[in-house]
Design a protein with these regions (language model features):
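Active-site region of chymotrypsin-like
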Residues: 125-133, 161-219, 227, 232, ...
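Conserved active-site neighborhood of the chymotrypsin/trypsin-like protease fold
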Residues: 27-30, 58-59, 76-156, 218-219, ...
Length: 345
């Protein structure tokens, strides 16, 4: 699968997108497909679930006097006040206000976020919220019409609507941080600064993605996080406050030029293993402090996004094999099973 280098949509000058449609994350019922609606009917169905997220950030350095501010979008996914948005939108945020479709502003707080998926969960206390229906569709088709809804540039007058098609599926792009975003929907629906975190909706009025990134050097190429890929993690974010990843007993670090220089590495790609615990799965399986992981079950690894995505691809198999730079044999790691989630309060 080709990995395309791209730029994330910034907050108040970044380039990000919208979110989506299916059953409530606390429900196990899959919603059957509705009839196709007109675009105005789709907008009428979803618009009240789309919010504006206004942020004030922490100064990037002590020399900065004024904190930066920004705006983005989000989508209500639960009557209890949970809102799905992008991690890049809330990173370094000092305070946050959420603008509802009614025009009301209410304080918001980040309750979970994950930089590898660029996903965040915001919580507000408000009454009469209208959650969107999330739709982790496995049958989304190239050429299918989709609608992006968000609040680009924090313009007055409510959310903005753009229409396009699914241009491609299962895209992977490289972020400026050197990590890879996977399972992206490519669309030609216009995504602009401030659209980040808003929904990409199919013509049944259900969210199939969360708008996240654009290709700045190309025309009509935007990307959304696939709801099919992120939906399994939403309940964990609501209950645990984080996305579940197995505790293998080491700290993975993406190898960058600065990491190479700091540790005197001769390998220029992969994931560096630090703080290996000899009593946990990685150490028991033969991983040593300072090892460089270059593949997981023969899937090449260039960064932490690659590493965790490869582990997810392992499915229910009990072990994975890590290929290590400069070592003849792999390390075989036994994967721990996740603890059962308790019902959300």
């Amino acid at each position: 699968m080709a990995i395309l280098p791209l730029i994330l949509i910034p907050v108040a000058g970044l380039l990000f997108g919208s979110s989506g449609a299916w059953a409530n994350p606390g429900s196990s019922a899959v919603v059957s497909a509705d009839k196709t609606l007109s675009v105005p009917a789709v907008v009428a169905k979803v618009r009240s679930s789309v919010v504006t997220i206004l942020t004030r950030g922490v100064p990037a350095s002590p020399s900065q006097v004024q904190s930066g501010s920004g705006s983005g979008s989000g989508v209500i996914i639960d009557e209890g006040g949970y809102i799905l948005t992008n991690n890049h939108l809330v990173t370094g945020v000092k305070s946050m206000a959420v603008g509802l479709s009614t025009g009301r502003l209410t304080p918001g707080r980040v309750v979970a976020r994950d930089f590898l998926l660029d996903l965040a969960l915001v919580k507000i206390n408000a009454q009469d919220l209208v959650p969107a229906v999330l739709n982790p569709r496995p049958d989304l088709e190239i050429g299918e019409s989709v609608v992006a809804i968000g609040n680009p540039l924090a313009l007055k007058g409510g959310s903005t609507v753009t229409v396009g098609v699914v241009s491609a599926l299962d895209r992977s792009v490289l972020t400026p941080d050197g990590e890879t975003l996977y399972d992206l929907i490519q669309t030609d629906a216009a995504i602009n600064p401030g659209n980040s975190g808003g929904p990409l909706v199919d013509l049944s009025g259900r969210v199939v993605g969360i708008n996240v990134i654009i290709a700045p050097s190309a025309q009509a190429i935007s990307y959304a996080l696939s709801m099919q890929a992120i939906y399994p993690h939403i309940q964990s974010m609501m209950v645990r406050g984080s996305i579940y990843r197995p505790d293998l007993g080491f700290t993975p670090v993406t190898i960058t030029p600065s990491v190479m220089a700091s540790f005197g590495l001769d390998g220029d790609r992969g994931v560096l293993a630090l703080q290996v615990d000899a009593a946990k799965p990685a150490g028991v399986g033969g991983l040593q402090n300072g090892d460089i992981i270059t593949a997981v079950d023969q899937h090449q690894v260039f960064n932490m996004g690659d590493f965790w995505h490869a582990l997810l691809r392992s499915g229910d198999q009990p072990t994975v094999q890590l290929t290590l730079h400069g070592r003849s044999g792999p390390a075989t790691i036994q994967l721990p099973k996740p603890a059962a989630l308790k019902a959300a309060q």
